[in-house]
Regions:
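Phosphate/dinucleotide-binding and metal-coordinating scaffold of catalytic cores
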Residues: 1-253, 257-258, 271-358
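Conserved protein-kinase catalytic-loop segment immediately C-terminal to the catalytic Asp
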Residues: 264, 269-272
């Protein structure tokens, strides 16, 4: 059997279950999927392994809170391998709200415009499953399961409203407060960023943000881009600085100022133009529910975005302001720290460090 890997309505590659492969549109391949046209047995095995791993990555991760309940609700196994998870993702064509790739079987009569999640409604039942861990029966699981593939450990779900999709993130009152407070601070600086607001779901606090992807723009994680660069013998950070140094440096500045210690390689990356499958800049800065950690000293934690170098968050932020300045557009209102006076003192101290470094 052959699978066709699709980018919107175009077939970019064909792959058999034995690893035979034909790449049709190399420039439109997923960044983190490597397929090689070869008769070599080992390379064909690698093709199959890479394909199933890529498909599995488009489904919820098993270490997600409530993951077992979610899997039960869509009738899936609780203990699954990459291949089994891939089969679950393939059952709904590996659809995603993060990009426009999908998969179909050869000669299957189906179009992206008929099934893509940007244009077709989702059941509100998904929100219950993802956020509260309820046992529910989801009849249209082929459209629902993928909407949990947002990465990370915190319960989250996409909710469709009249003006588009919104991400609701749970994780407890403290995580929500941290994310919303960090967002209020970041808005005082010139940076592409996701705006987080506080809301309620079933009498529990959630942070709410609008989707940044669409049928025109996709998100590619740093992890995926690193796979792509490695296979081209490029230095990933060099390519990112070449593409969008200001956004990279602002990320390091703001993560330092708000004490975000969780900037791992799945929650930052590129915004890609789907017309060309080429990156246009870093995607909007997001994910602050681990802000105000290791926030009792000016140094901060180790910076996770500087490649193999060993820098503290302070050192990375100082390097950043010396390259692009602080780019503060308005003062941070003191009232935002009303419930956290110790955080206010640390923020002001870190802000002074960066101003003095310019």
């Amino acid at each position: 059997m052959f699978y066709e890997i699709m980018h919107r309505e175009s077939c970019v590659a064909q792959l058999s279950t034995t690893g035979e492969c034909r790449v049709c549109l190399e420039d439109f391949m997923p960044y983190d999927l490597v397929l090689v046209e070869s008769d070599d047995f080992d390379e064909r095995i690698n093709n199959v392994t890479n394909f199933y791993y890529w498909c599995a990555s488009r489904m919820l991760t098993l270490d997600r809170t409530y993951a077992k309940e979610i899997l039960n609700s869509i009738g899936a196994s609780q203990s699954v391998t990459d291949r089994e998870r891939a089969q679950i993702a393939l059952s709904y064509h590996c659809l995603s709200l993060l990009d426009v790739f999908w998969v179909k079987e050869e000669n299957e009569k189906i179009r992206f415009e008929d099934i893509n999640l940007f244009a077709h409604s989702l059941s509100n039942a998904l929100v219950d499953i993802a956020l509260r861990g309820h046992q529910m029966t989801v009849t249209n699981a082929h459209l629902l399961a993928n909407d949990l593939s947002t990465g990370g450990l915190y319960p989250k779900a996409w909710v469709r409203k009249e003006d588009g999709f919104y991400l609701y993130k749970d994780g407890g009152r403290e995580a929500v407060e941290r994310e919303v407070l960090a967002s209020k601070i970041c808005r005082c600086f010139d940076c592409h960023q996701v705006l987080y607001e506080q809301g309620m779901f079933e009498n529990e606090p959630v942070s709410i943000s609008k989707i940044m992807t669409s049928q025109r723009y996709s998100l590619v994680t740093y992890a995926a881009y690193d796979v792509y660069c490695t296979n081209h013998d490029w230095n990933t950070l060099d390519k990112i600085l070449e593409l969008d140094a200001p956004s990279y440096y602002m990320m390091n500045i703001l993560d330092y100022l708000v004490g975000n210690t969780d900037r791992h390689w799945e929650n930052w990356g590129l915004l890609v133009d789907n017309e060309t499958n080429q990156p246009i800049r870093l995607h909007d800065l997001m994910d602050f529910n681990r802000a105000f950690q290791q926030y009792d000293t000016p140094e901060g934690a180790n910076c996770l975005t500087v490649g193999k170098r060993h820098l503290s968050q302070k050192d990375a932020a100082v390097e950043a302001v010396r390259n692009i300045g602080l780019n503060q557009v308005r003062q941070v209102e003191q009232t935002v720290f009303s419930e956290h006076p110790a955080w206010k003192a640390t923020f002001e101290e870190r802000l002074r460090v960066l101003r003095n470094a310019m």
